[in-house]
């Protein structure tokens, strides 16, 4: 007999498969999150049933022993760390061995620095590859932040750099970023900016004992 995947409000056990699916969807969606309509469409249920699944999952995450939460922000649902654990996340960022950034993270950061505010889709169009992981890394290290929402379908998140970004690279203002040629296309932007940040990161690494 085929296992029932949809949610019945009067049967708590049937909610388990749907909760697991929603959790996986939100994890895969990352910072962009998913709307109620998107979740309902994937589960093949109406929005009221999808909302019940989300509420059940939110209740699970509200327990003290859970380190993440399910938030609703600007009409979309997404997973995020709890604020009470911010001090531990800061320790992770400052821990020895955590200072170096991957090539993918440097590329993504360079694009954001020069093109902010910018959406994930625009970043991926320039890089030519998915950028979920680099964005998560940069967010975790507080080098970038959400600065708003773009107009249009889904109102995607806009990313920009932070004060920590300036501190990390020893800059006082964004004006200290080296100017790019006016004719630079997206490929040239990525190459030039990436070289600059890679060199800065190497210098910072050499200065550390």
From Swiss-Prot:
Biological source species: Geobacillus thermodenitrificans (strain NG80-2)
Name of the protein in its database record: Segregation and condensation protein B
Record keywords: Cell cycle, Cell division, Chromosome partition, Cytoplasm
Keyword Transmembrane: no
NCBIfam families with a match to the protein in the record: SMC-Scp complex subunit ScpB
Compartments reported by the entry: Cytoplasm
Family: Belongs to the ScpB family.
Domain of life of the native organism: Bacteria
Description of how the protein assembles with itself and partners: Homodimer. Homodimerization may be required to stabilize the binding of ScpA to the Smc head domains. Component of a cohesin-like complex composed of ScpA, ScpB and the Smc homodimer, in which ScpA and ScpB bind to the head domain of Smc. The presence of the three proteins is required for the association of the complex with DNA.
């Amino acid at each position: 007999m085929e296992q029932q995947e949809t949610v019945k409000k009067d049967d708590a056990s049937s909610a388990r498969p749907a909760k697991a699916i929603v959790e996986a969807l939100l994890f895969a969606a990352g910072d962009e999150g998913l709307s109620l309509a998107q979740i309902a469409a994937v589960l093949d249920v109406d929005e009221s049933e999808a909302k019940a699944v989300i509420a059940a999952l939110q209740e699970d995450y509200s327990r003290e022993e859970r380190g993440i939460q399910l938030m609703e922000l600007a009409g979309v649902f997404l997973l995020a760390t709890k604020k009470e654990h911010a001090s531990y996340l800061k320790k992770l960022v400052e821990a020895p061995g955590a200072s170096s950034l991957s090539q993918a993270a440097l590329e993504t950061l360079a694009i954001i620095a020069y093109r902010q505010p910018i959406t994930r889709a625009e970043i991926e169009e320039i890089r030519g590859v998915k950028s979920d992981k680099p964005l998560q890394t940069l967010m975790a290290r507080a080098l970038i932040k959400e600065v708003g929402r773009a107009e249009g379908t889904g109102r995607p998140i806009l990313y920009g750099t932070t004060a920590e970004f300036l501190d990390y690279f020893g800059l006082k203002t964004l004006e200290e970023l080296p100017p790019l040629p006016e004719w630079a296309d997206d490929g040239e932007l990525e190459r030039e900016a990436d070289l600059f940040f890679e060199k800065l990161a190497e210098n910072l690494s050499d200065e550390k004992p």
